[in-house]
């Protein structure tokens, strides 16, 4: 078999915004139009990102960077992220969302209700990129031309973000984790981990891997994207113990029997959460709020910490049962984290 190992990684909307912001600040302060800029990322890597254009005027400069999605199918691929910079009188960096950036209308998301949909991690990325240029006070306005139109074809409205796209990203890098060929990469990575460990921690995404690294050696953790079921099958044949560690929204799909969690394969997150909440005996008024929520994160805001623990214990037990049903001999453990990284449930560990 010939494996295409030259998969192209992309950049997140947050990385594109950080690069555009840095290029705009350089234009504002140095009157210089850069073709590329280098930005820091939360994981320590530095990215050199092309800049499409820089416009410099009196007291303001704007720059555009195109979102590049690599080999991930993404409706945002090629979308322009525009940042405009001007000085302010403080020593602070103020980041605001302009036209084409969505507004948060429901609770439970990382951005506060009423604010623009720019994640805290992205705000930190933008600030760190600008601080490599200046210590002065800067106002950055992030815009996305046609972002309101593009957003109509995303899931934003379903989670309470309206009027534009979200500016997101936990690492700055977009990994082609949902590609079929990625299974070959997973096989290779599992073999490497097996040389040092008799167990493996399967984490669907970056946040899950980050939280799991507080409990396990980071070298024992593999990020598998949407291919949770396939990864468990592969791992169960070579490891003494397999640990699935994830956040509620992703694992609620597994609770429903969806082992490839890509959105094209199905979605039963809120239905699963409602079902588990009924089994946990949550009050009717809380159940009503959960069924009317637009996201798992929003639904969690209506539950106490103890209620979350009871519900996620049921979810973890059902996942364990499902995994055992197709591989009864597996030594399997499920850990579900809250959105702040705290462990809500551990079953089979």
UniProtKB/Swiss-Prot annotation:
GO-annotated molecular function = cobalt-precorrin-5B C1-methyltransferase activity
Q: Does the keyword Ribonucleoprotein apply?
A: no
Alphabetical list of SUPFAM superfamilies matching this protein: CbiD-like
Q: What class of enzyme is it?
A: transferase
InterPro entries, per the entry: CbiD (IPR002748), CbiD_sf (IPR036074)
Q: In which pathway does it act?
A: Cofactor biosynthesis; adenosylcobalamin biosynthesis; cob(II)yrinate a,c-diamide from sirohydrochlorin (anaerobic route): step 6/10
Q: Name one Pfam family in it.
A: CbiD
Q: Where is the signal peptide?
A: none
The answer to whether keyword Transmembrane applies is no
What does the UniProt keyword field contain? Cobalamin biosynthesis, Methyltransferase, S-adenosyl-L-methionine, Transferase
Protein's gene = cbiD
Q: What is this protein's name? A: Cobalt-precorrin-5B C(1)-methyltransferase
Please indicate which superkingdom the organism of origin belongs to: Archaea
Q: Which NCBIfam families match?
A: cbiD
A single GO BP: anaerobic cobalamin biosynthetic process
EC number(s) given by UniProt = 2.1.1.195
Instruction: State the organism of origin.
Output: Saccharolobus islandicus (strain M.14.25 / Kamchatka #1) (Sulfolobus islandicus)
Report the catalytic activity. Answer: Co-precorrin-5B + S-adenosyl-L-methionine = Co-precorrin-6A + S-adenosyl-L-homocysteine
What family is this protein classified in?
Belongs to the CbiD family.
Please list the disulfide bridges: none
């Amino acid at each position: 078999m010939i494996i295409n190992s030259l998969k192209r990684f992309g950049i997140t909307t947050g990385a594109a915004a950080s690069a555009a912001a840095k290029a705009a600040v350089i234009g504002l302060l140095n009157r210089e139009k850069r073709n590329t800029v280098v930005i820091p990322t939360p994981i320590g890597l530095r990215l050199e990102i092309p800049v499409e254009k820089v416009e410099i005027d009196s007291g303001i400069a704007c720059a555009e960077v195109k979102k590049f999605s690599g080999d991930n199918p993404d409706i945002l691929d090629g979308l322009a992220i525009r940042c405009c910079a001007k000085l302010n009188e403080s020593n602070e960096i103020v980041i605001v969302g302009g036209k084409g950036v969505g507004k948060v209308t429901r609770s439970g998301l990382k951005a506060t209700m009423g604010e623009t949909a720019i994640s805290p991690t992205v705000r930190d990325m933008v600030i760190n990129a600008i601080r490599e240029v200046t210590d002065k006070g800067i106002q950055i306005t992030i815009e996305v031309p046609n972002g309101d139109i593009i957003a109509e074809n995303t899931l934003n409205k379903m989670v309470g973000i309206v009027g534009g796209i979200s500016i997101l990203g936990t690492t700055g890098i977009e990994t082609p984790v949902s590609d079929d060929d990625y299974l070959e990469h997973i096989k290779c990575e599992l073999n490497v981990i097996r040389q040092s460990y008799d167990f493996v921690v399967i984490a669907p995404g970056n946040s899950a891997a980050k939280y799991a690294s507080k409990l396990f050696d980071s070298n024992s953790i593999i990020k598998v994207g949407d291919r949770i079921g396939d990864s468990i099958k592969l791992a169960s044949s070579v490891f003494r113990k397999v640990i699935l560690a994830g956040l509620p929204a992703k694992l609620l799909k597994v609770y429903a029997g969806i082992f490839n969690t890509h959105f094209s394969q199905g979605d039963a997150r809120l239905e699963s959460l409602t079902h588990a909440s009924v089994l946990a005996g949550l009050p009717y008024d809380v159940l009503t709020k959960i069924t009317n929520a637009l996201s798992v994160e929003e639904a969690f805001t209506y539950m106490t910490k103890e209620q979350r623990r009871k519900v996620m214990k049921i979810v973890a037990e059902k996942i364990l049962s499902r995994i055992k049903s197709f591989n009864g001999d597996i030594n399997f453990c499920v850990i579900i984290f809250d959105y702040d990284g705290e462990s809500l449930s551990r079953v089979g560990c």
